[in-house]
């Protein structure tokens, strides 16, 4: 395991020196992407099982949508939404991330066996860092100068958006260290679409080398995001192929990537193929294609 990209959460070591797949489980009826499909418990459980079978390295479970203009739910309701889903994922042996910005919800999730807290607010809850330290939890530190559920509409927030991300991460890491959270528990996320125009999100991706300088795994939450829809004029459910292209491109460049996706099987296969292309995996000179894999759906003649 590469020491520089060692990720340790709740006593579990995760090899982040290769591209990892984070599959999304929305335990909420109002997700921008698939809320209607995931509004009931059987669908959420089926999604957990699907992600595990598809080879997702991490499952990211959220009980409250980040959509602005939708009222914030209570802490109790958020905990009620995620509890059975977290229990299902933990029982399946998955590494579990919970998407919440509230320390009370984070503590409840970690008590159920979750490993990572994915916080879109970047420690806006003053109790969050102490919860992380007490539970020895992993943490996603996302660049977001705004508050949860509030859309920042200004387009001139930054002289240089990448400079702003770097400064924000530096300050956040200092706060986490002061609370007793080790660097090896931290994942960094530049926050695509959050307080950013589509152009600014694209700029962060193009200047990936500056973001990779922290030598921490980078969460790339690019799946179905606005910058893709803006570039190609597509609604969320039509953005999966373009998402795959963006994910493979960034994974071919950044040394340690965790890709958050709604389509884990395709991304897992793409990352595995990337491993053959960049030399992390290889074929033996005598390897040949199994004849049963040569054609699709052909039945032998009699």
Q: Can you say where each PLM-predicted feature lies in the sequence?
A:
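Hydrophobic "anchor" residues on beta-strands that sit immediately upstream
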Residues: 22, 56, 95, 115, ...
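Catalytic-pocket segment enriched in acidic/His residues
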Residues: 29
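Phosphate/pyrophosphate-binding loops at sites that engage ATP/ADP/AMP, CoA/4′-phosphopantetheine
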Residues: 53, 94, 170-185
């Amino acid at each position: 395991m590469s020491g520089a990209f060692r990720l340790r959460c709740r006593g579990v070591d995760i090899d982040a020196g290769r591209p990892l797949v984070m599959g999304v489980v929305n335990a909420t009826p109002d997700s921008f992407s698939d809320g209607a499909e995931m509004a009931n418990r059987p669908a959420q459980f089926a999604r957990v099982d699907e992600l595990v079978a598809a080879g997702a390295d991490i499952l990211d479970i959220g009980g409250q949508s980040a959509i602005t203009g939708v009222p914030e739910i209570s802490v109790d309701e958020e905990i009620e939404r995620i509890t059975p889903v977290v229990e299902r994922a933990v029982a399946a042996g998955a590494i579990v991330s919970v998407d919440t910005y509230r320390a009370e919800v984070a503590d409840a999730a970690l008590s159920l066996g979750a490993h990572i807290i994915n916080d879109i607010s970047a420690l806006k809850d003053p109790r969050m860092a102490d919860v992380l330290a007490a539970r020895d939890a992993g943490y996603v530190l996302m660049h977001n100068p705004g508050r949860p559920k509030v859309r920042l509409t200004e387009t001139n927030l930054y002289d240089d958006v990448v400079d702003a991300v770097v400064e924000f991460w530096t300050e956040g890491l200092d706060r986490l260290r002061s609370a007793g959270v080790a660097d090896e528990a931290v994942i960094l996320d530049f926050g695509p679409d959050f307080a950013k125009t589509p152009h600014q999100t694209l700029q962060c991706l193009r200047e990936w080398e500056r973001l990779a300088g922290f030598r921490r795994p980078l969460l790339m939450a690019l799946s179905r995001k606005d910058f893709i829809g803006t570039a190609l004029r597509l609604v969320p459910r039509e953005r999966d192929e373009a998402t795959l292209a963006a994910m493979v491109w960034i994974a071919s460049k950044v040394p340690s990537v965790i890709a958050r996706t709604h389509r884990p099987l395709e991304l897992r296969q793409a990352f595995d193929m990337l491993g053959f292309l960049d030399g992390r995996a290889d074929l033996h000179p005598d390897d040949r294609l199994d004849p049963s894999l040569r054609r699709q759906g052909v039945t032998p003649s009699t």
